[in-house]
Amino acid sequence: MSNGIVIIGSGFAARQLVKNIRKQDATIPLTLIAADSMDEYNKPDLSHVISQGQRADDLTRQTAGEFAEQFNLRLFPHTWVTDIDAEARVVKSQNNQWQYGKLVLATGASAFVPPVPGRELMLTLNSQQEYRACETQLRDARRVLIVGGGLIGSELAMDFCRAGKAVTLIDNAASILASLMPPEVSSRLQHRLTEMGVHLLLKSQLQGLEKTDSGILATLDRQRSIEVDAVIAATGLRPETALARRAGLTINRGVCVDSYLQTSNDDIYALGDCAEINGQVLPFLQPIQLSAMVLAKNLLGNNTPLKLPAMLVKIKTPELPLHLAGETQRQDLRWQINTERQGMVARGVDDADQLRAFVVSEDRMKEAFGLLKTLPM
């Protein structure tokens, strides 16, 4: 292939793609360009760094140099790509440019920070780099406010609480995990967080932040306020699409791709958190792994469509872990909930009594794979 494959990004998606390409072709030129150090780390570990007493550098599994040597790559770390000339098939940075035969965007997603006064005081934990920038403040903080009660917010709330910190979690919704499941299903974890000492401020809104002599004053609705030492935004991710937009690619929530992971330009593909696959943004490990396997084949000329099975999503809250699958967010499902001391099985069924979703917890997570087989594709 003329000029080989250029990949923008160095996270989980990019690395999975490299490994799958190299299983099939040991010599095709591969170039990776990324704004970070390109060291490998396990991103889900960020939800547990405080209770584990880990520093940012402790998360590194493989250095960029070791990665390059193992997989025969050209790496350009700490490099910001400024533009893509799709017609000329050239990627540009301020001081360099790279010709490509095929280009892959694996630019990930950035943490959304609510646009309130004082938003610059909010921290995010979406990368090793972001944790490195704030690890001292988080380790020293006694009082922590987490903004957002979704998957990451719930994981962080439990982790900081396990580390002995006073944790407050605020969310507009009436229950935690509101975008993933109904309150009658999430209530078991919500109760456990409360038992542990997490102060839940649900149906509440953060209105602003202000630095004080003794911490950060968070102003809430209904004339309430709370003083803390650190504020973490856990209000979701936004796919990184700016580069693709400047290149003239079709954008919706993410970079739009088809079942072959191909964008609106025949020579440009997208993978991972930045990609919107046939209308779906899937920022979870399993779909990224499966997508990387398919994309490697497609880049090497073995055109294969992506077919995603029903997949598990894991909520890593060690005191009460959950697995879920299917259309758990559907409003029209009837939930059949079986709760025992050792865990919960919640089944979401439609009007025809067909299983469409499930959530399992604790010791009953072992039932997940059996339930997974009964979900429709």
Curated annotation (Swiss-Prot):
Keywords: Cytoplasm, FAD, Flavoprotein, NAD, Oxidoreductase. Pathway: Nitrogen metabolism; nitric oxide reduction. GO terms for cellular component: cytoplasm. It catalyses: 2 reduced [nitric oxide reductase rubredoxin domain] + NAD(+) + H(+) = 2 oxidized [nitric oxide reductase rubredoxin domain] + NADH. Belongs to the FAD-dependent oxidoreductase family. InterPro entries: FAD-bd_OxRdtase, FAD/NAD-bd_sf, FAD/NAD-binding_dom, NO_rdtase_NorW, Rbx-bd. This is Nitric oxide reductase FlRd-NAD(+) reductase. Its cofactor is FAD.
